[in-house]
From Swiss-Prot:
It is an enzyme of class 3 (hydrolase). It is a multi-pass membrane protein. This is Protease HtpX homolog. The lineage of its organism: Bacteria, Bacillati, Actinomycetota, Actinomycetes, Mycobacteriales. It comes from Mycolicibacterium vanbaalenii (strain DSM 7251 / JCM 13017 / BCRC 16820 / KCTC 9966 / NRRL B-24157 / PYR-1). Its EC number is 3.4.24.-. Its main location: membrane. Pfam families: Peptidase_M48. The chain crosses the membrane at residues 10-30, 33-53, 145-165, 182-202. Belongs to the peptidase M48B family. The keyword Ribosomal protein does not apply. Keywords: Cell membrane, Hydrolase, Membrane, Metal-binding, Metalloprotease, Protease, Transmembrane, Transmembrane helix, Zinc. Signal peptide: none annotated. Zn(2+) binds at residues 135, 139, 207.
Amino acid sequence: MTWHPHANRAKTFLLLVLFSGLIVGVGALFGRNIMFLAVLFAIGMNAYVYFNSDKLALRAMHAQPVNEMQAPVMYKIVRELATTARQPMPRLYISDTAAPNAFATGRNPRNAAVCCTTGILQMLNERELRAVLGHELSHVYNRDILISCVAGAMASVITALANLAFFASMFGGNRDGGTNPLAILLVSLLGPIAATVIRLAVSRSREYQADQSGAELTGDPLALASALRKISAGVERAPLPPEPQLADQAHLMIANPFRSGEKIGKLFATHPPIADRIARLEAMAGPDTYRHPGLY
């Protein structure tokens, strides 16, 4: 298999530059002294995001590390796929939630982690689970997860900055003549929108690519199509709770973790439609491919 990490390194660098510019720009609204502090804050946050982005996602999902004895099937599949790909094996985690989903996180293949929820482990058969883990490993080996984790951390910080700007506009006023309360108010209103746009920008095309790469790694596109169909139905029955810290990490999941009818499910629709992804995978398999009754 051929992996494509270089383009995502460049995208990550551009995201960090954008992130820094946004922080400095918000700082400038509060005056020169605050802008200087914002520069230092941007440098510190870039370092923190780069080295700790995996911890943010795992913490949000209350994920716990597991070994071969605790999760033998998951461990066996990931070890086999990593060997096939000639890539490092990531750390494995399980999140104890009925919501069926999976995600990968970490700044590079040697510092990566793959997490499955108990819901997805109970829902899928081994062939489907293998397809899902192949999808997640494709994110790891293409270095999608670095840009995804940076985007998620950026979204969290942007939301925090928006809240700060809102309270500053409410209580800070323009007493020292160095701030523009209208501009600050605009930041507080547009910040959450910017956070959502960032997540959307890095997520949708990655999922199509990971579907294709994962199907090539496992050699079983129909199993992934079947898994996506089950996950989509399962999310409607058992979605993740609509909490901000989970919304900030939603783009990492293999499928949108929120119920489609909920407001947050529409606002944070970071994934392409499941039907489109399934259609592409079935096209990969070919029109004459036998559909296993255990899958469909």
